[in-house]
Structures are given as structure tokens and as C-alpha cells.
Amino acid sequence: MRWIGIDPGLRITGFGVIDVDGQKLTYVASGTIESGDPAKGLPERLGALYAGVKEVLETYRPEQAAIEEVFLNVNPRSTLMLGQARGAVIAALVSEKLPVAEYSALRVKQAIVGTGRAAKPQVQEMVKRLLRLSRAPGTDASDALGVAICAAHHSQIPKAITSALASKKRSK
């Protein structure tokens, strides 16, 4: 199963693509999509994010998508802008008929590092280790890969429960 994880941002949006085969995670690609010059209008910048995500989807053809949820910022304007960027990204994902899972930053950090209070360098290091990379990707790409890994692990939980219940029934 191929997953794409997205760490949305108005200025820079990170993406990470992984293949999942049972418990095996394989790195495919990661990078960033930039919305362009902040002097450009918001609609143009959102359009650039949408187009950039569509290009990544066409290149890597994921089967599932996951995106980080918006967190409440001290600055309400920043939260609103992030929400709009996230909306442009989600629109690109659903335009390709991808199922989209959403995870909080806390949940992603718990899945990757084991604590929701992990710092970005800790997330980068664990992503590097989990995907057996020679060096850690940049913070935006690492965060996006973390979202994909978190989603892949959470998608395995219902299968594991179903399998355990089926095996319990057979043993009776």
C-alpha cells in the first residue's frame, strides 16, 4: 500500500511517500512544495499548493493519504491561513479520489517517537531510523513522512484486531 503524508503550510508544505507491506516500511520520496512569493495574493499561493500536490500525486500515485490537523496558534490569523492552505491540499487529495486520514501533531509524535512532546530533531531522527535512511530529510519532509508512518500504523490496528478475534474464534 502506498501512502502519502502531508505537513501543510502556507509558505512550505512537506510531503512524504512510503510503501507499506505488512510491518515493512519503504521510503519512496519526500520533499516540499512552496507557494511562492508572499507578495503574491492568497488565491495564487493556494493555487500553487494545489497544483504542487497534484503534481506529486501524479508522479507517485499513492493509494491512501494522511494530513496533519491544524493546531490552534497564538495568532488567529496564522491559524486561519494554515487552515486555508490545508483546505487547498485536501481539495487536491480528494480530487484524485484518495481517502484522507487526519492526525494531530501530538498523535504523530507519539506514533513516531513515543511521546507527544517530541522536538522536531527527535522526529527527524526516528523517521531516518524507521525508514533506514542515510540522513534525515528536512523538517517539513520529515514531519510529512511521520504523518504517513503514523497513518500506516493506525491503518494496521483494525486488521490486527480482526485477525486476533478470528484466531480466538477458531481456537474455541
UniProtKB/Swiss-Prot annotation:
Mg(2+) 2 binds at E68. Mg(2+) 1 binds at D7, D140. One of its GO terms (cellular component) is cytoplasm. It catalyses: Endonucleolytic cleavage at a junction such as a reciprocal single-stranded crossover between two homologous DNA duplexes (Holliday junction). It is an enzyme of class 3 (hydrolase). This is Crossover junction endodeoxyribonuclease RuvC. It comes from the Bacteria. Its cofactor is Mg(2+). It comes from Polynucleobacter asymbioticus (strain DSM 18221 / CIP 109841 / QLW-P1DMWA-1). Homodimer which binds Holliday junction (HJ) DNA. The HJ becomes 2-fold symmetrical on binding to RuvC with unstacked arms; it has a different conformation from HJ DNA in complex with RuvA. In the full resolvosome a probable DNA-RuvA(4)-RuvB(12)-RuvC(2) complex forms which resolves the HJ. GO terms for molecular function: crossover junction DNA endonuclease activity; DNA binding; magnesium ion binding. Binds 2 Mg(2+) ion per subunit. SUPFAM superfamilies: Ribonuclease H-like. The active site is at D7, E68, D140. Its EC number is 3.1.21.10. The RuvA-RuvB-RuvC complex processes Holliday junction (HJ) DNA during genetic recombination and DNA repair. Endonuclease that resolves HJ intermediates. Cleaves cruciform DNA by making single-stranded nicks across the HJ at symmetrical positions within the homologous arms, yielding a 5'-phosphate and a 3'-hydroxyl group; requires a central core of homology in the junction. The consensus cleavage sequence is 5'-(A/T)TT(C/G)-3'. Cleavage occurs on the 3'-side of the TT dinucleotide at the point of strand exchange. InterPro entries: RNaseH-like_sf, RNaseH_sf, X-over_junc_endoDNase_Mg_BS, X-over_junc_endoDNase_RuvC. The lineage of its organism: Bacteria, Pseudomonadati, Pseudomonadota, Betaproteobacteria, Burkholderiales. Pfam families: RuvC (PF02075). GO terms for biological process: DNA recombination; DNA repair. It is found in: Cytoplasm. Signal peptide: none annotated. Belongs to the RuvC family. Keywords: Cytoplasm, DNA damage, DNA recombination, DNA repair, DNA-binding, Endonuclease, Hydrolase, Magnesium, Metal-binding, Nuclease.
